[in-house]
């Protein structure tokens, strides 16, 4: 129910075209920022440049539109609505759903429409709280600059210098990816797919590897507080779940799996079972942290 479809449509005079259907698009990624340069016969000699950033301190993001020689009266129609699929597999983050699942329904019931004038040189669109809004130029500039400052600091925190100019940008890209899986307490399982908390996933190696030792310590402290210490192992092996063809341990406190020493998947919780046993991964990451 929280998934939204956002789309843009460009209008010049009595003609319009979806923004992703323009004749030419140059798309680039730079360590947490996407940029697009768009041209089309509909624009004549005009050029539309778009820069997109996520907010560093809230769920949301901002588009900056920069116009050059655009036709007079050009408009950008902005739409946000519910998505077509009513139910998604694993929140839709694993690519297991139909290709059109995130498209707008043919007859949206919750669609909102905004018009952005492209007569100036710069304009902004913000998405926050699952809604679009068109901020004033001063506010938009402030929000964009704040987000760009954060992005730039993250990018510059890890620098690689080699004779290969195509390899060197990986430092900033790696730092941006690492920041994307940090939720304030722990390193998440993944940034898009599997964006969930797991105590021993491989992401926890990244903190010390790129020099973010404070985040690494926060992660390990958070999960050290999730280790079970008051449930002795009273049920001997075998304790596999017959309903699952012995493929997993039966979820019952007191088994060798779910007893003292077991680390739960959510920080600061000691009462949560999960089919993974990630103790070995967590301890290996912790030892590498001590080594650093």
Residue ranges and their predicted role:
Residues 1-41, 126-159, 163:
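An extended acidic
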Residues 14, 43-45, 261:
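Detector for glycine-centered tight turns/loop "hinges" at secondary-structure junctions
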Residues 18-26, 45-51, 109-114:
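Short small/polar-residue motifs
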Residues 29-31, 56-60, 196-199:
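Short, surface-exposed loop/turn motifs at beta-strand boundaries within globular domains
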Residues 37-56:
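Low-complexity, acidic Ser/Thr/Pro/Gly-rich terminal tails and inter-domain linkers that flank the onset
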Residues 50-133:
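Polysaccharide-binding surfaces and accessory modules of carbohydrate-active proteins
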Residues 89, 102-119, 127-164, 168-181, ...:
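Preference for long, amphipathic alpha-helical scaffolds in soluble/luminal domains
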Residues 149-292:
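Substrate-binding groove/exosite segments of carbohydrate-active enzymes
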């Amino acid at each position: 129910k929280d998934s939204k479809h956002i789309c843009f449509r460009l209008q010049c005079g009595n003609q319009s075209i979806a923004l992703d259907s323009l004749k030419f698009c140059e798309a680039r990624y730079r360590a947490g920022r996407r940029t697009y340069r768009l041209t089309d016969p509909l624009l004549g000699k005009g050029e539309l440049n778009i820069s997109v950033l996520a907010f560093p301190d809230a769920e949301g993001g901002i588009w900056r539109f920069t116009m050059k020689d655009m036709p007079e009266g050009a408009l950008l129609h902005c739409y946000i609505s519910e998505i077509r699929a009513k139910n998604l597999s694993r929140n839709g983050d694993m690519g297991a759903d139909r290709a059109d699942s995130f498209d707008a329904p043919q007859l949206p019931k919750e669609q909102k429409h905004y018009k952005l004038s492209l007569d100036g040189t710069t304009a902004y669109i913000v998405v926050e709280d699952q809604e679009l809004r068109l901020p004033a130029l001063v506010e938009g500039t402030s929000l964009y600059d704040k987000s760009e400052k954060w992005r730039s600091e993250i990018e510059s925190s890890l620098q690689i210098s080699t004779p290969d100019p195509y390899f060197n940008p990986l430092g900033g890209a790696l730092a941006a990816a690492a920041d994307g899986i940090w939720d304030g307490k722990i390193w998440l399982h993944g940034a898009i797919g599997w964006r969930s908390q797991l105590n021993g996933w491989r992401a926890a190696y990244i903190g010390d590897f790129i020099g973010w030792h404070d985040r690494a310590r926060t992660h390990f402290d958070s999960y050290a507080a999730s280790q079970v210490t008051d449930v002795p192992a009273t049920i001997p092996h075998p304790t596999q779940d017959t309903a699952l063809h012995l493929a997993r341990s039966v979820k019952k406190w007191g088994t060798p799996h779910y007893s003292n020493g077991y680390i739960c998947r959510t920080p600061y919780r000691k009462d949560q079972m999960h089919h993974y046993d990630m103790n070995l991964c967590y301890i290996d990451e912790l030892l590498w942290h001590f080594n650093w």
